[in-house]
Amino acid sequence: MAILFAVVARGTTILAKHAWCGGNFLEVTEQILAKIPSENNKLTYSHGNYLFHYICQDRIIYLCITDDDFERSRAFNFLNEIKKRFQTTYGSRAQTALPYAMNSEFSSVLAAQLKYHSESKGTDQVAETQAQVDELKGIMVRNIDLVAQRGEKLELLIDKTENLVDSSVTFKTTSRNLARAMCMKNLKLTIIIIIVSIVIIYIIVSAACGGLAWPSCVQK
């Protein structure tokens, strides 16, 4: 279970986005955004095995796509956090911004928050108050049909293998960095042991030879 895709848009104008894995997210999202009214609203669209959650406030749409078994409360916690961060960072600039104007900066925020709210350990840290639960009860779920430009039914296609490849690369990089760090740690420990051994040997020899200059052992 995970948040698969997140986007911030003004109407159908995408300002920032991030995808957890490969898929035809943009093609599907464009149709979803076109169906969202401009007034302030919160809603969940259901399509196949996926849910499209959104918050629209001041013409700015905060939308994410999840599996249908992903908790809606977690999805809207994610959207509320994204909305707060986006409004704090950009304010009224979003009302006139060009397409993808915030993507270079805000996509990393989307990625970090998407990961945090998708992981199970993040759920324990996100306190759901009774007010949030009550608010969720008022957010409707509607079925939605998507149609491609050619007229046939449009399905959301997900390729999670892309994320698995990225995860594999990340794991290999992390493992390599860990091995390098352990090697450096062992090298430092070896050097310390050698230095301590030399000092101990020097002290023993000095004691046997009558002093630090080894007067009784060194012939003049």
Curated annotation (Swiss-Prot):
What's a single GO CC term here? Golgi apparatus
Q: How does it sit in the membrane?
A: Single-pass type IV membrane protein
| One GO BP annotation of this record | endosome to lysosome transport
Protein location? Cytoplasmic vesicle, Secretory vesicle membrane; Golgi apparatus, trans-Golgi network membrane; Late endosome membrane; Lysosome membrane
For this protein, the record's Pfam families field holds: Longin, Synaptobrevin
The record ties this protein, via Gene3D superfamilies, to: 1.20.5.110, Longin domain (3.30.450.50)
User: What is the superkingdom listed in this entry's lineage?
Assistant: Eukaryota
> Has UniProt tagged this entry with the keyword Transmembrane helix?
yes
Q: Which residues lie on this side of the membrane: Cytoplasmic?
A: 2-188
Q: Where is the v-SNARE coiled-coil homology domain?
A: 125-185
Q: Where are the transmembrane segments?
A: 189-209
Record flagged with keyword Ligase: no
Q: Longin domain: which residues?
A: 7-110
Q: Which residues form a coiled coil?
A: none
Q: GO MF annotations for this entry?
A: SNAP receptor activity; SNARE binding
Query: Which stretches are Vesicular in the membrane topology?
Result: 210-220
Q: Say where the protein is mainly found.
A: membrane
Q: Name the UniProt key words of this record, in alphabetical order.
A: Coiled coil, Cytoplasmic vesicle, Endoplasmic reticulum, Endosome, Golgi apparatus, Lysosome, Membrane, Protein transport, Signal-anchor, Synapse, Synaptosome, Transmembrane, Transmembrane helix, Transport
Q: What does this protein do?
A: Involved in the targeting and/or fusion of transport vesicles to their target membrane during transport of proteins from the early endosome to the lysosome. Required for heterotypic fusion of late endosomes with lysosomes and homotypic lysosomal fusion. Required for calcium regulated lysosomal exocytosis. Involved in the export of chylomicrons from the endoplasmic reticulum to the cis Golgi. Required for focal exocytosis of late endocytic vesicles during phagosome formation.
Which protein family is it in? Belongs to the synaptobrevin family.
What is the protein name stated in its UniProt record?
Answer: Vesicle-associated membrane protein 7
Native species: Gallus gallus (Chicken)
